[in-house]
Amino acid sequence: MDKTELIQKAKLAEQAERYDDMATCMKAVTEQGAELSNEERNLLSVAYKNVVGGRRSAWRVISSIEQKTDTSDKKMQLIKDYREKVESELRSICTTVLELLDKYLIANATNPESKVFYLKMKGDYFRYLAEVACGDDRKQTIENSQGAYQEAFDISKKEMQPTHPIRLGLALNFSVFYYEILNNPELACTLAKTAFDEAIAELDTLNEDSYKDSTLIMQLLRDNLTLWTSDSAGEECDAAEGAEN
């Protein structure tokens, strides 16, 4: 199947909410080796975000059930086996995405925007791996995630407006990493607040095309700040996960 057909099929799969098919098509497009257009890049990102998202939420539900189940319960082994099955699927998806990023996408990125987009993606997928990892494996995965986010963050500060949706989305996810993975609410709040304040200060630079995306992410940054500051103030509040991009 040629590139045009693969992209048409990916769009069709998206409309049908068949994200596994969508991801398969966009993986094939990526493996053809050419730099992706913005549209192709977004199709790839949406496909895998949905594919991995289903596993992440399933893993959380099963883990929660596992924690509430008595260890002597006969169902315990069944629950554990099922969690491990979902974990295995999640790891496989993340590994596939990280291979595409390292082999094709980051190497082929010719502009700062694409580079930041893909490095953010790399940080995200290592973060998803860190959510289910333990021991030395978790430590290494966290380091990989932080390294990718930091590299993307440094480029975005140098090359992009504070109101750019990719820069804002990166700040959002990097702050979630600090809060949820490193358990560092102070740094998470500082990063999110700085990104929000810098964007507010330069609202006049908002591109008309990206106005909706930028303001939505700014709202998510503010929502997370509200949630995290109420958490740290010790209010009766579930440690709900922060919104991410």
Swiss-Prot record:
**Where is this protein found?**
Cytoplasm
**Gene Ontology CC, one term:** cytoplasm
Q: Where is this site: Interaction with phosphoserine on interacting protein?
A: 56, 127
Does Transmembrane count among this protein's keywords? no
SMART domains for the chain: 14_3_3
Where do transmembrane segments lie in this chain? Answer: none
The record's listing under PANTHER family reads: 14-3-3 PROTEIN
* Complex formation: Homodimer, and heterodimer with other family members.
Similarity comment: family membership: Belongs to the 14-3-3 family.
| Protein name per Swiss-Prot or TrEMBL | 14-3-3 protein theta
Natural source organism: Gallus gallus (Chicken)
The record lists the lineage as: Eukaryota, Metazoa, Chordata, Craniata, Vertebrata
